[in-house]
């Protein structure tokens, strides 16, 4: 199988989403797997903090450090030069505030050559998302089941099962959209094709299954 001829650009990605075309993102942590994905039609790779559980054998993602994300993202970038690479921002690399978030995002982009970053959280991290985007770094939001706050959520449980929880997710998505987030990763929620979500054509949704 031949490699992709070129990497999808951020403007091309936005155009595809605006036209309703699907985009595929696969989670990868190392050079060999990145090489395989680069030879596939998949447009994006996520270097997730889940590497703590999948690669390191940890019980949670929170111990993963910014340096470890950078290390793995750098390896993935070498293996997938023609695929858009997303670097996950690990626990406590952005929670302090917008300036810390910008510094962490900048390190991921500068030191690993990733194309954009992903952040967990909704309206509470929207100011940090806006700060990073203003600096020229694309950001993907992540709401629903967020592993970094799983303890506060009562464990790895489906979110948005009640009308109140669903409304909170919609508010989170709106806040990220207003902060100019590239798209939103909606993980493990209790509703599918919710009319409130599907009617918001300006929202960039990416459904990720557990």
Regions found by a protein language model. Give the residues of each.
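Alpha/beta enzyme core
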Residues: 2-209
